[in-house]
């Protein structure tokens, strides 16, 4: 409560807020006693760690944009949408500055050693990641649907469409229709690195919302293509979602799988382009994964990293990630 964060985890705490807001949206009577306090406390206190929720890591900032948009959706309190829009401006001002277009991971001078470990981040501007560019597209698309004429007509939708055109031409989506981790800055080509589950999920709700804005099904069609390809390429024989690091993820990568699960639930509940067979595939995916978590990855309500088991040590990242899948399954039941 002192920091408004969970275990001092900065961007994972944004995902906890998003998960709880999602739970609140579908089960308000069950959630309200918890979420009323969480939303107000985190909103008031967490930015004491980084004023304005800005730390120069564009992906971190954009996770908070998505969190406060989700909270706005369930509270209708404009202060949350105001905050999301304010945070977004930092990334908007930086978009397009890389040699390949798009957005960097991080401002060169940004680093708070007490909160973040920089070993994996691009302090020297040597890589352009998928994550921050997916988050940018999704954040812009969501802001466009909630503030289509503020601060001016087209302000956000133009950013979302620009980000979409950049992303599909970037090469980040590979021949298997899944998304690699980034671009090689020397060649502006797909770096062929890890295919993480969260990179398959972040884009999905933004693409679905672009179809809402434009009436063009191609955006939602791409979301379905990526989602189905991820289920094919990132699940085990039992259909349980995996990540390349599942036997040794760090505290950040522990968060990843839940992002994909939450995105699949969004498509089931809110996508306007979804045939019955694809919907059934998504619903089954969520239920199978939630059941596996509870049967094989849960001890005394503590949820571990590997959704197929064996049971492991829980952290706020593994807990909230697994809860994304469980909440998702409940929301589509």
Question: Over which residues does each language-model region extend?
Answer:
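CBM-like carbohydrate-recognition segments
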Residues: 1-59, 63, 71-74, 80, ...
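Oxyanion-binding "anion nests"
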Residues: 202-214, 218-235
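Extended ligand-binding groove/face enriched in aromatic
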Residues: 37-146
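Long alpha-helical scaffolds in large eukaryotic adaptor/regulatory proteins
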Residues: 27, 75, 140, 147-150, ...
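Acidic, serine/threonine/proline-rich low-complexity intrinsically disordered regions
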Residues: 148-154, 212-221, 270-283
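Active-site cradle of extracellular carbohydrate-active enzymes
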Residues: 133-136, 140, 144, 153-210
């Amino acid at each position: 409560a002192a920091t408004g964060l969970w275990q001092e985890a900065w961007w994972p705490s944004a995902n906890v807020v998003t998960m709880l807001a999602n739970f609140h949206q579908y089960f308000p009577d069950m959630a309200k006693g918890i979420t009323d306090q969480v939303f107000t406390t985190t909103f008031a206190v967490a930015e004491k760690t980084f004023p304005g929720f800005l730390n120069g890591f564009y992906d971190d900032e954009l996770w908070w944009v998505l969190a406060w948009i989700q909270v706005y959706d369930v509270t209708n309190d404009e202060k949350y949408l105001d905050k999301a829009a304010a945070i977004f401006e930092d990334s908007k001002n930086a978009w397009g500055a890389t040699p390949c277009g798009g957005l960097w991971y991080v401002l060169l001078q940004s680093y708070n050693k007490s909160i973040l470990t920089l070993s994996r981040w691009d302090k020297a501007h040597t890589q352009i990641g998928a994550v921050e560019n997916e988050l940018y597209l999704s954040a812009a698309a969501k802001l466009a649907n909630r503030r289509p004429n503020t601060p001016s007509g087209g302000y956000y939708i133009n950013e979302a469409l620009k980000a979409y055109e950049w992303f599909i031409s970037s090469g980040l989506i590979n021949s298997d229709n899944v998304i690699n981790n980034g671009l090689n800055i020397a060649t502006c080509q797909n770096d062929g690195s890890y295919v993480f589950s969260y990179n398959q999920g972040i884009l999905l709700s933004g693409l679905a919302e672009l179809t809402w804005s434009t009436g063009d099904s191609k955006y939602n069609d791409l979301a379905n293509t990526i989602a189905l390809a991820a289920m094919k390429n990132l699940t085990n024989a039992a259909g349980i979602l995996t990540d390349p690091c599942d036997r040794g993820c760090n505290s950040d990568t522990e968060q990843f799988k839940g992002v994909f699960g939450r995105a699949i639930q969004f498509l089931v509940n809110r996508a306007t382009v979804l045939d019955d067979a694809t919907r059934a595939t998504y619903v089954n995916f969520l239920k199978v994964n939630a059941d596996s978590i509870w049967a094989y990855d849960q001890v005394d309500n503590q949820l571990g990293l590997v959704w197929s088991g064996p049971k492991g040590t829980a952290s706020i990242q593994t807990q909230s990630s697994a809860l994304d899948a469980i909440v998702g399954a409940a929301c589509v039941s």
